[in-house]
């Protein structure tokens, strides 16, 4: 329970947001998380908590908070959506988020500093004193105690994305109203993998509905944008545009993993017309000889490894596309009157269907 963390009761943040788990050099499993309140309130305020267990599937017990060698808790940058990897005995922790405040025209950035301070639980002085600002994903190494920072944190992608492959923008009104992002740059949901000596940094992009990735020969620098792995609205498949999304799109987090010699991407999509109810999904992916991962199309097969058998019955909620031709992007919004996956005390089902709704299984 998150309530084991003493900060949960003090701050009124009882939820573990976007956790990640790694095995320590002592053979135990460590769960890294950030505490959050309802609908993400306070989730940017840190610190990063850690729970520990002898087995990967629980039961985890509160262990401590990520800190510097002098014992002070780590609040540098934005402690959010942590990811961890045991890199041959070196424990690496990644975290962060990104908003385009630092790319605003002169004079505008200063106007939004109080908004940043409120969002991130910092003072304006703390924000302006951090070279390059507090935005972007960062990496640090931990001691074997899995709590104490040994080196870093250092930023691994440019905070100022202008003129880079990570260039991303947001309409000025969106700075207050919510997700009005454009581009494939980092937003949140960091994850890290090492494949064939290459580091894969997987993240939820500012477009919000897709997992993207960048690669490097190094764990903490020189990452190169490589592309989109999956979109929960199949945006980008066959040139499909945002307005042509095949599902209600919204936040997706996830990563890739090799299971029995085959690679898969794990992600989630929206149900019940809200960004705060999500269905876990998976698709097989291919890593090409050059290290690239072509974007995968959503299917109804998941981890089946082959087409579903043409007999028996399947849940309606495994449809890969559900659209009336005008599906919204959710961000933090909720919707009624659209086709959606839902449930009651008896079953899961599709609702909000109307003339012209497409329900696709493949």
Task: Show which residues each predicted segment covers.
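Carbohydrate-active catalytic/glycan-binding domains of CAZyme proteins
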Residues: 1-362
């Amino acid at each position: 329970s998150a309530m084991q963390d003493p900060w949960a009761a003090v701050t009124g943040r009882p939820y573990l947001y976007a956790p990640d788990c790694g095995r320590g050099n002592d053979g135990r499993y460590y769960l890294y998380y950030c505490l959050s309140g309802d609908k993400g309130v306070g989730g940017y305020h840190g610190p990063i908590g850690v729970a520990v267990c002898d087995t990967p599937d629980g039961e985890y017990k509160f262990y401590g908070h990520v800190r510097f060698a002098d014992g002070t808790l780590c609040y540098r940058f934005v402690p959010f959506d942590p990811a961890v990897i045991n890199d041959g005995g070196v424990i690496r922790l990644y975290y962060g988020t990104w908003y385009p405040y630092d790319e605003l025209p002169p004079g505008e950035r200063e106007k939004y500093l109080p908004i940043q301070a409120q969002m991130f639980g910092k003072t304006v002085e703390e924000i302006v004193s951090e070279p390059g600002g507090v935005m972007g994903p960062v990496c640090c190494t931990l001691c074997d105690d899995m709590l104490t920072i040994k080196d870093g944190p250092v930023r691994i992608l440019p905070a100022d994305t202008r003129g880079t492959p990570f260039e991303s923008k947001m309409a000025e009104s969106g700075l207050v109203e919510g997700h009005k992002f454009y581009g494939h740059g980092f937003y949140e949901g960091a994850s890290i993998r090492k494949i064939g000596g290459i580091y894969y940094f997987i993240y939820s992009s500012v477009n919000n509905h897709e997992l993207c990735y960048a690669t490097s020969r190094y764990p903490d620098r020189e990452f190169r944008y490589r592309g989109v792995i999956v979109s929960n609205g199949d945006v980008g498949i066959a040139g499909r545009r945002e307005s042509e999304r095949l599902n209600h799109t919204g936040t997706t987090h996830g990563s890739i993993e090799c299971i029995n010699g085959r690679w898969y991407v794990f992600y989630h999509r929206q149900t019940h017309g809200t960004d705060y109810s999500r269905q876990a999904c998976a698709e097989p992916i291919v890593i090409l000889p050059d290290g690239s991962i072509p974007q995968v199309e959503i299917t109804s097969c998941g981890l089946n490894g082959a087409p579903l058998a043409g007999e028996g019955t399947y849940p309606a909620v495994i449809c890969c596309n559900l659209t009336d031709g005008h599906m919204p992007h959710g961000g933090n919004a909720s919707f009624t009157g659209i086709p959606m996956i839902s449930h009651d005390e008896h079953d899961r089902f599709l609702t909000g269907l109307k003339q012209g709704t497409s329900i696709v299984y493949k």
